[in-house]
Amino acid sequence: MEADWNELLRIPLPPPNPHGLPTVATTIAFDDVSELLWAGNEYGRITSFYGPELQRYTSVRAHPVAEGPVRQILFHERGVISISSRSVHMITRRGLTQWHITHDEITDLRCMSFTAQTNKIIVAGCQKAMFTIDIDKGTIVDKLRTEHNYVLMKRSRYLCAATDTGSVNALSLTDFSVVKSWKAHGAAVNDMDARGDLLVTCGFSIRQTGSPIVDPLANVYDLKTLSPLPPIPFHAGAAYVRMHPKLQTTSFVASQSGQLQVVDLMNPNAFKLRQATVSFMLGIEISPSGEALAINDAECFIQLWGSPAKIHFNEMSKEVEFADVTPRPPQVDWSPEIPLNVIGMPYYHERLLSAWPSHLLFEVGSPPAPIDPSIVPYLRSGEMGQYAANPKKTRRYQVENTRALASTEPTLIAPKFLSEKAREQSKKADDPVGDTAASLAGARISGESEDDPLLKYSNVEIKYSRFGVDDFDFRFYNQTCFSGLETHIANSFTNSLLQLLKFIPLIRNIALHHAATSCIAESCLLCEMGYLFDMLEKANGQNCQATNLLKTFSSFREASNLGLLEENLTNKSLSSAIQAVNRFFLGQIAQDYRRIAPNSEELDMRLATIASESIRCMFCQNEIVRPGNTLVNELMYPAIDMKQARRNHTLRFSNILRASIEREAQNRGWCHICRRYQQSVMRKTAHRMPHVLMLNAAINSPACRRLWTIPGWLPEEIGIVLEGGQVLCFEGEDLRMRIQGQMPGLIIYDLVGLVAEINIPEHQKAHLVSFINVSVSSRERETRSKWHLFNDFLVTEVDKEEALRFNQSWKSPCVLAFQVRDARHMVDDTWKNFLDTTLLFRDWSLNNGRPVESRVMLSDEEKPTPGTPVALDTEFVDLEKAEINVKADGSQEIVRPSKSGLARVSVLRGSGEREGVPFIDDYISVKEPIVDYVTQYSGIKPGDLDPRTSPHNIVPLKVAYKKLWLLLNLGCVFVGHGLASDFRKVNIQVPKKQTVDTQYLFFHPSKNRRLSLRYLAWAVFKEYIQEEPADSNQGHDSIEDARMALRLWKKFQEYEDAGIVGQILEEIFREGSKLGFRPPPRNGVTTVLSRPGTAVTMQNNSGRNTPSTPDVGAAASAPTTPRQAFRRSIALTPSNGTFSGPGSGEFFTGSPLK
């Protein structure tokens, strides 16, 4: 290591997916053929980096996620070889797979090495066999039995292999027999390297207290004489070692704290020291040239060390092959005026494939007929496959046309877009009933369909028109007053569980009371649940989205490590995934609750089963008792004989629940008295039952699944008594008798609902739904059950028998929720009286940035009250571009619309002495990649949203959202232009009585046009706003837009008081049609910004393109004002309350009142 050696570069290992967090590198290695550095991660992915700049070159998923991390990487002239616990994989350096090897006896691979033959490798691990693999053929050529568990391998004069007990074996390179063995370290070998005749090892020894500690010595062995040499002292703890590739006696030794020592093994007193800036080092690797050193640390970074003037990885490297530069296509003058035959067709000399003769067309590979689901429960295993009795539903030798069956499979027909309905209504306004009938033709989602009763259980999918999601008719899927949740959001498979938690009154109360506290932690899942539950209640049947909550859920490293995120569900059933998410949600709720109330037992009383676990050694009878509290109980099933299931009372749901709470199991465990593993008995004793009993169905065998098929097996109510440390559980007639007898200590639980997995093979992929008895959480005192199906945004009422029937093979229960009967209808809204409004009256910043000078915080005298008007405007940036599918006919279908992120929030006073003065002007910290700042329209520039570089006041999304949520629940009335778009992107639901949208105030009933704020400002006040600045880095000012919307509202009030609203609107639209609804040029120069698509009649300046509708007679759901004088504006709004559209507008010389 020369004097100028230092850290040259530090890069994070790329995350496993675009929305994931960086992960640590489980192994790193320098390529000895090309100028590449390779790294593997814990998701089975290997990534390469090119040159000293570590430019990302290739990234390949080499092993399934379920196999865990990449353990080691080796290099061959033909490619790169990697291993995980259960497979060996080889790729080319460009990322193409060469071969992939698995074997029944490959269970836990740890290491590999080349043998004496350069075209063969040997792989080993903590298993009973080693395997020799031919690299050229990609096959296993030999299997070798071994008594040792090997964790590391290095090849030199011998094949040096380290065991998991701290020994190092020198193996023969020919037959792999043990030539010599050393007990190198007391506990384990952490790292080792061999080169020439020397072997150096680092490892751990056991302290007197029993915990391992890094040895302060690096052991050295002579492979020529097979004898140990004097060790190398390293007081910081020798954790990692690498031999220099050129200097045979020089070694790099490193500690876990980052201390590096370059030492001569023959002269330990001659050494050089360096200190790497790491919190915890995970490994080092030296390049074949000896001029570069890579360090892997626990903060997911890879550091590159070396001399800036000399660094290179290999002395002679093959040229790295990069992707070919795509030639630019020739310029073609493509316009409607140019005939297509001018372009011409390529010359051909053979017959075209499109002219394939019809007599050579054959139908092959017809899919087999599906198995009748009614016979699946009766299948029995045979010598080959399974068999069952013939149900005799078809004729003998009858053949089914499976292709025709697949093409005529009934599906849930998507409704027409709202814009299509609006156009049809304008053409045929006298037949609204016919239009509704046409929209609903072919499918019904409530009740039993004539074609297929399973349609309501199908996957539902949002279709997008050019106007975005607001053009989709959600009311087609939901005619109830309960809101559904949208899909097309990462991890939206949890929608069903979130709906279930919302309808449990006690959990709903906890979440809302917590959200009303001073908690502003970004990762607080309980706050996000409170916001979501409040939004679902205020929506009153309109569709909602759990964007903010799911974004918080995705940010948890624990959720990613446990494989709970959508990207990790490839090899995992949805049933087991949602049960794991249920455990995670409730555990995280408990942590979030204790963050504000650490000493409160309220959460334990409501959710936790207070219990203790006793573990008794069956040999010495020693017993250990420890707490065994749990938030979720897993059902445990005994051995089941279906012939006796109906008559055997031990197989009733109540008895299985009792055995699950008082679980008892036998297994082997460590006994500190016997000082060995002994057979032990674990028994759980419950001391207090919770108010909310959450259960995971845990169906893990066909026998357990058949138990649920018994009609009425799942009761709608159960009774539990804790008596003398035992749990007694009752159901059915037994429970009714004890209720009549007023049994002391009896706790009655009602079934609130359940989450079920729906897996209908002919109805797309598996998904989750929830069945919920909404009467439990209703505010009206009623005892009749009202069961509803929640299938994402499809919500419909079902009867109790259908909800609790599981004799269909495609419907399986996953999560159950019971609540004490005393808490029925206990919907607590007192949290609104205890809102912590501190956030509205004090500054909060991530970067101590300075807000705009005009912003003045609210004073105590200005505390908002119900009806207080505030002006709102927001700005957004693009996080993802729209995904568009171009069909064969050239038409385009929007598969997924663009995704926006909140970037700025401005809120102004709407009344008082400081009317129009902002009291909130926050820029939002955005952690996701931003694909477009849309500076011209948002005014947001690169760096504005980064707390490290932004000159503005930066706050987390949670803080900005909570401020708006507080204003909403304080009863403020929001004034703005195109508020529907702002509210949707902020992900907040505002009742119609609390919105004043100037887009609807200045709307003419007979005009198919929504006027832009820019045009209205000129038309009413003769003022120019949103003008194109001289500097392209400038853009809209949200404070200016909010203030203009406020002024327009005030002016509209003047028009109403004067009774001239109709006259004003007529004049505005008459003059606007002459000017194209744009302000005239200032001084003859056009200065108005024009968004793309301004030629379209239905537009939206607030960033939300939605259609308008000419039918305004039934405008029941448009935004309105809180004043009685705004009845006319209600009549001017379109149905569904979601239409808003930009127009580019202009007109009019000012108010006629002047």
Swiss-Prot record:
<feature type="binding site">
    <location>
        <position position="982"/>
    </location>
    <ligand>
        <name>a divalent metal cation</name>
    </ligand>
</feature>
<feature type="compositionally biased region" description="Polar residues">
    <location>
        <begin position="1096"/>
        <end position="1109"/>
    </location>
</feature>
<comment type="function">
    <text>Catalytic subunit of the poly(A)-nuclease (PAN) deadenylation complex, one of two cytoplasmic mRNA deadenylases involved in mRNA turnover. PAN specifically shortens poly(A) tails of RNA and the activity is stimulated by poly(A)-binding protein pab1. PAN deadenylation is followed by rapid degradation of the shortened mRNA tails by the CCR4-NOT complex. Deadenylated mRNAs are then degraded by two alternative mechanisms, namely exosome-mediated 3'-5' exonucleolytic degradation, or deadenylation-dependent mRNA decaping and subsequent 5'-3' exonucleolytic degradation by xrn1.</text>
</comment>
<dbReference type="InterPro" id="IPR028881">
    <property type="entry name" value="PAN2_UCH_dom"/>
</dbReference>
<dbReference type="GO" id="GO:0006397">
    <property type="term" value="P:mRNA processing"/>
</dbReference>
<dbReference type="Pfam" id="PF00929">
    <property type="entry name" value="RNase_T"/>
</dbReference>
<keyword id="KW-0507">mRNA processing</keyword>
<dbReference type="InterPro" id="IPR030843">
    <property type="entry name" value="PAN2"/>
</dbReference>
<protein>
    <recommendedName>
        <fullName>PAN2-PAN3 deadenylation complex catalytic subunit pan2</fullName>
        <ecNumber>3.1.13.4</ecNumber>
    </recommendedName>
</protein>
<feature type="repeat" description="WD 1">
    <location>
        <begin position="20"/>
        <end position="59"/>
    </location>
</feature>
<feature type="repeat" description="WD 2">
    <location>
        <begin position="102"/>
        <end position="145"/>
    </location>
</feature>
<comment type="subunit">
    <text>Forms a heterotrimer with an asymmetric homodimer of the regulatory subunit pan3 to form the poly(A)-nuclease (PAN) deadenylation complex.</text>
</comment>
<dbReference type="Pfam" id="PF20770">
    <property type="entry name" value="PAN2_N"/>
</dbReference>
<dbReference type="GO" id="GO:0003676">
    <property type="term" value="F:nucleic acid binding"/>
</dbReference>
<dbReference type="GO" id="GO:0000289">
    <property type="term" value="P:nuclear-transcribed mRNA poly(A) tail shortening"/>
</dbReference>
<keyword id="KW-0378">Hydrolase</keyword>
<dbReference type="InterPro" id="IPR036397">
    <property type="entry name" value="RNaseH_sf"/>
</dbReference>
<feature type="region of interest" description="Linker">
    <location>
        <begin position="316"/>
        <end position="451"/>
    </location>
</feature>
<dbReference type="GO" id="GO:0046872">
    <property type="term" value="F:metal ion binding"/>
</dbReference>
<keyword id="KW-0540">Nuclease</keyword>
<keyword id="KW-0269">Exonuclease</keyword>
<keyword id="KW-0677">Repeat</keyword>
<feature type="binding site">
    <location>
        <position position="873"/>
    </location>
    <ligand>
        <name>a divalent metal cation</name>
    </ligand>
</feature>
<dbReference type="InterPro" id="IPR013520">
    <property type="entry name" value="Exonuclease_RNaseT/DNA_pol3"/>
</dbReference>
<dbReference type="Pfam" id="PF13423">
    <property type="entry name" value="UCH_1"/>
</dbReference>
<dbReference type="InterPro" id="IPR048841">
    <property type="entry name" value="PAN2_N"/>
</dbReference>
<feature type="binding site">
    <location>
        <position position="1041"/>
    </location>
    <ligand>
        <name>a divalent metal cation</name>
    </ligand>
</feature>
<keyword id="KW-0853">WD repeat</keyword>
<dbReference type="InterPro" id="IPR015943">
    <property type="entry name" value="WD40/YVTN_repeat-like_dom_sf"/>
</dbReference>
<dbReference type="InterPro" id="IPR012337">
    <property type="entry name" value="RNaseH-like_sf"/>
</dbReference>
<feature type="compositionally biased region" description="Polar residues">
    <location>
        <begin position="1132"/>
        <end position="1141"/>
    </location>
</feature>
<keyword id="KW-0479">Metal-binding</keyword>
<dbReference type="InterPro" id="IPR036322">
    <property type="entry name" value="WD40_repeat_dom_sf"/>
</dbReference>
<dbReference type="GO" id="GO:0000932">
    <property type="term" value="C:P-body"/>
</dbReference>
<dbReference type="InterPro" id="IPR050785">
    <property type="entry name" value="PAN2-PAN3_catalytic_subunit"/>
</dbReference>
<feature type="region of interest" description="Disordered">
    <location>
        <begin position="1092"/>
        <end position="1154"/>
    </location>
</feature>
<feature type="binding site">
    <location>
        <position position="875"/>
    </location>
    <ligand>
        <name>a divalent metal cation</name>
    </ligand>
</feature>
<keyword id="KW-0963">Cytoplasm</keyword>
<dbReference type="GO" id="GO:0004535">
    <property type="term" value="F:poly(A)-specific ribonuclease activity"/>
</dbReference>
<dbReference type="InterPro" id="IPR038765">
    <property type="entry name" value="Papain-like_cys_pep_sf"/>
</dbReference>
<feature type="repeat" description="WD 3">
    <location>
        <begin position="276"/>
        <end position="315"/>
    </location>
</feature>
<comment type="similarity">
    <text>Belongs to the peptidase C19 family. PAN2 subfamily.</text>
</comment>
